[in-house]
Every structure is written in C-alpha cells, then in structure tokens.
Amino acid sequence: MQKRTDATLGEQLRRVAEDAPDRPAIADSSGCTLTRAQMLQQAELVAGWLLEHRCGEENIGVCLAASVLAAVANYGITLAGKTAVNLNFTAGDQHTRAAIELCGLKTILTSRAFLARLGMPALAEMISVEDLPSHQNAAASAACPSPESIACILFSSGTTGVPKGIPLTHANILANAEGLARRIPPSDADCMLGVLPFFHSFGFTFALWFPVLHGMRVAYHGNPTDARIIGDLAEKHKATYFLSTPTFCQQYARKIEPHQFSSLRYILVGAEKLRGSVAGEFKDHFGIELLAGYGCTELGPGVAVNTPWEARPGSVGRPLEGIQVRIANPDTLEPLAPGQQGMILVNGPSRMPGYYKAPELTRQAIRDGFYVTGDLGYLDEDGFLYVTDRIARFSKLGGEMVPHLPIEEAICELTPSFVAGIPDERRGERLILLYTTPEIPASVIHERLLKAGLPALWIPKREDIHAVTAIPVLPSGKVDLRRARELAESVG
C-alpha cells in the first residue's frame, strides 16, 4: 500500500496502528513483543511525559541499543513533536559530549540496565524509559509538526574527520522509506530483522521507521556481531527482510546455520563495498543473493539498490524513485557522460536541508541542490550506479594519484586488508598495508600484489606490509578510516 509522503511520521504511525491494532508489531531478543496498539500506547506514554515535563526542550537524546524500548522511545519523541537524537554510545565520551553540546541536549532517554552494562557517565539528565509512570496522559496535546519539521539529528560516522550533525525531516524519511518500498515492495506478512543501531542512518530510517510505516513486523537485537543470537532471532520470527553490511554478513556466513536464514527473501547491504568474495561466500552458505545498495546519511540514507529481479554485479543498483544522480568532474562539477568516472552528486526528496548549525559546511556540501558525496563512480547506459572509491581514499605518490581500493581488492581472497597513505619526505606519501591474517607472511602478500597486474607505483614495499590483530571498524561494520589511519601511522 502506498504511503503518504506529505504527512508526518507520527501521523503515519497512528494510522498504521489504528488500522490493525491487534497485529504483532515489534519484538526483540529479550522476548519482549508488542502489538501495534501496545506499541502506540507505550509511545504515547513517553510523548505525554515529554510534553508535561520537557515542554521547552526541542531535542531529546536517546542512548539505547536497537530494541523494543529504543523504538518506543523514538516513537514517543516523534509523537511529542520533538526531534530525536540517537547517541553513538560506542564512540567515546568526546564524541558523545560534542553531540550533546551541539544539540543542546538536557534530557536523554535510556534504561537502567543499559547504562549499567555500558558503564557510561551521566552526561545529561538520564531518564529510564521503563521508569516513566504508566498513568501518564497521552500525547493528544502535542503541537503537530509539519512534514518539513526536523524528525531526527544523526551524525556522520566521522571516518574522515569530526562528525557533523545531520538533520532529517519527516518528509526526508517518509520519501526514503517510500522509495525503498516501491523498489522492493514489503507486505504486512513480512518481518524485518533489525540489528543496526538507530544512531546509524541505515538503522534509523530502514530498521526503525520503514517496517512500522509499511505494516511489517520487526525483530530487534542490539549487537550486530552476536551472530548466534541473530540466527536464533531470524529463525524464531521467520524474518524475511534484513539490512546489514558486508562485514557483518561475512561473519554470519561463518557462524549461522543455513536453516536459520531460510525464511529471508531480501538482504540489503550497504555502508561499504560488497566484494565478490563476500557475496559468493554468503550465497554458497545460505543460497541467498546479497543486494548491494548505496547511500549517505545526508541523503536519508538510501540512494540506490539492486533487486532480485534487476541487478548488475559490481553495481549498487539503480537510484530509488525521485533520486537524481549526477556524475561530475571532481574539480569543476560539470556533468559527465555515462561510463565516465567522476564525483557522485545526488539530489532528491530525502536530501537533508543542511548540516545542523553549520551553514558554511552546508554551502560546501550542497551545490546547485545536489549533495556532493565525496565518492567516485559512474553510471552505465542503463542507469546502474557503480561506486569505485572515496576521493579521500587516494594517495599522491610522486605526483600521481594512487587509489587504495584496487590494492585491497587484489588480496581480498587471501585476507581482509586496509591501505593508508602516511607522510613521506621523499615522495609526499607512502603506502602502508595492514592485514589481519598473521599466519600469512607479509612476503606472500607482497608476492600476490606483484602478480596482480597493478602498476608498480601502487604496490606497497615489503617492509610496509604489516599483520595486525584487527582493523578498526565502526558499529555499522565499515572501516573506521580515522582510527585505521592512526594504526597505520603507528606501525609505519
């Protein structure tokens, strides 16, 4: 059923709940399950408390892993006409304090059990959602926001610098959810397996809001690395829709029994490049194709996705309905023809209005209505998008630009790896290669690179190839570029 994109998230939430109040709605790995009516009732209790006790606060924080409680907290904030700010509880105090200060957070919704497990200091007034009074007045008196009101403030992953506040409106999220629904239509018989955190845009839009907006059930677990629990959860709830990342999917292919994922129909992966070796390993184990997609937090996040009936190997699919993708010269931003590689620019109804309290950053990032992604790629003649690298993932050696991704791909069947450029007095930069399979000698890695047909300039020296325990990753599963570069500098 097509959903209105000129409404608000709260209006759509109520409409779905009132349409079939007794249908199961949300569940999690703790065993908690709510019907649509119960979900709405609990969200209204949160909203009522916020309206009575936090009337003057525009932004409300949330510090919870993906769960029924986290969903209810976010829905309650929305019903109260306020803005949800889901905090990245894995990023450390400095990142969290910066987010709290930028958004002026005075209240953070959490739970006693979660705080105790996390060991996080009280950085604002921490309110345990489970302790809110059950007799609280419902949210009937909430000021009704408009579709252009800010629904949430997310933060960039900070892989290449200081995280930025990214506001998304009700209209942004509704349009993005509708775009995915038109590309891969769900039904009320479907169940989403939701394991990505709500502070990640992929998790916020597509695991928190997409299921409830389209009448799907959803089953949550708060740690995407808990393969055993995720397998049990998928089997128990007969999950059909799953959002993940290639890194996590590779773990699942090695730790989850094939029958546990047998009900899954659609597995969408994003946040990093889907390598052929990972896709092949997953299909061999589960018999399911991974569907590569592409997005950015600033774009809602969804931009493009492959489907089971329309896919191109190596691509991230065609743009979602209403999304305009332009490939441009990185220096001049002049449009390029199909097949030509350039900077990926994107516009559409899910594009953020601008960075939060950062007009200069917004002017740099949005040109002629298009968001400048910082990613390089091309469109083929049929409109399929191919992402080749991030512009930040190049090194300048002796005046020549050297991409890091082809080097990593040359040894991806041997070992996970990461290439970074560190300062070098003679050549400007020097390539450092980190890999995580210490039983393979660095000489073998070097030999494989020499045989891969890469230009000699692209191949790190033998002494610059280092085995490490792990390559730092973000909660989304993609490489934490900043920390990985710091690791490369420390060993190089």
Language-model segments: residues:
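Conserved AMP-binding/adenylate-forming core of the ANL superfamily
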Residues: 14, 24-54, 61-71, 75, ...
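Conserved pre-ATP/AMP-binding loop-to-beta segment of ANL
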Residues: 6, 21-22, 137-162, 182-191
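AMP-binding/adenylate-forming catalytic core of the ANL superfamily
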Residues: 108, 242, 348, 353-354, ...
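AMP-binding/adenylate-forming catalytic domain of the ANL superfamily
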Residues: 429, 454-478
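Gly/Ser/Thr-rich phosphate-binding loop
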Residues: 239-244, 253-312, 324
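Conserved AMP-binding A3 loop
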Residues: 33-37, 151-178
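Conserved ATP/PPi-binding loop(s) of AMP-dependent carboxylate-activating enzymes
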Residues: 318-322, 334-364, 397-402
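Conserved AMP-binding/adenylation subdomain of ANL enzymes
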Residues: 174-191, 199-240, 255
